[in-house]
Amino acid sequence: MDYFTLFGLPARYQIDTQALSLRFQDLQRQYHPDKFANGTQAQQLAAVQQSATINQAWQTLRHPLTRAEYLLSLHGFDLASEQHTVRDTAFLMEQLTLCEELDDIEQSKDDVRLESFIKRVQKMFDARLQQMVEQLDNAAWDAAADTVRKLRFLDKLRSSAEQLEEKLLDF
C-alpha cells in the first residue's frame, strides 16, 4: 500500500495537509504499540512495524520535496538513490556562483548582504517549486524529476545560508 492510500489521500502532489495531519493522529492512536502490550508477540511486532510505516509515511508526505520525490517514485523515478545529476550547465554555473557568493558573505561576516542573499535564494526556490507543482499536475514526470533535482540544490544552499545566519548571530 502506498503512503497516499495509507492516509486516504489521492496520489498527487497537492494534498490537504490538514486531512493528512488528522489521519496521522487517527492512525497513530489505532496502531500505537502500547495498545498491543497484552497481545501476542506477533501482534506486538506487527503494531511496531505498522507504527514505523505510519511515521515514515507522515514524514515523507508532510515535506514538499520528499512528497514530490515519493510521488515521482510511484511513476518509476527513484530520486532518493539515483546517481543521475543535473545536466543543465547554466543552472550549475548559477549554483557555483551562488556558493561562491555565500563564501564571500561568510568571510566578510556581512549580515545585511546575507539577509538579501537568503531572500533571493528563497525566491528562486519558490519559483522552482511552483514550476514543479505545475509539472506534477500535468504528469510531466521527466521534467518534474529534473526540477526536483534542482530544488535539492537550492534547498541545500538555503539551509547553508540559514546556518551561516545562525552562526553570525551568535557573535
Swiss-Prot record:
GO biological process, one term: protein complex oligomerization
Keyword terms: Chaperone
Pfam family, one: HSCB_C
Domain of life: Bacteria
Any one GO molecular function term: protein-folding chaperone binding
Residue span(s) of domain J: 2-74
Complex formation: Interacts with HscA and stimulates its ATPase activity. Interacts with IscU.
Described function: Co-chaperone involved in the maturation of iron-sulfur cluster-containing proteins. Seems to help targeting proteins to be folded toward HscA.
Protein name: Co-chaperone protein HscB
Phylogenetic placement of the source organism: Bacteria, Pseudomonadati, Pseudomonadota, Gammaproteobacteria, Enterobacterales
